[in-house]
Swiss-Prot record:
It comes from Bacillus subtilis (strain 168). InterPro entries: Uncharacterised_YvfG, YvfG_sf. It comes from the Bacteria. Gene3D superfamilies: 6.10.140.40. Pfam families: YvfG (PF09628). This is Uncharacterized protein YvfG.
Length: 72
């Protein structure tokens, strides 16, 4: 298992979300996951801003890698 909130973690979860939502377009499934995670991170009052920013950066990097078809 990848380190929590790392790029590999988000890549793994994006791919799982796509697989679980095969009836949807790949980009639509990715966008759904992305919005859900960002919303959760933004609402987390216990996490410092720098930590939230780093998590969102990792999510964004993972999103772009999965979209381009990269695996790591």
């Amino acid at each position: 298992m990848s380190e929590l909130f790392s790029v590999p973690y988000f890549i793994e979860n994006l791919k799982q979300h796509i697989e679980m939502n095969q009836s949807e377009d790949k980009i639509h499934a990715m966008n759904s996951y992305y919005r859900s995670v960002v919303s959760t991170l933004v609402q987390d009052q216990l996490t410092k801003n720098a930590v939230v920013l780093k998590r969102i950066q990792h999510l964004d990097e993972a999103y772009n890698k999965v979209k381009r078809g990269e695996s790591k």
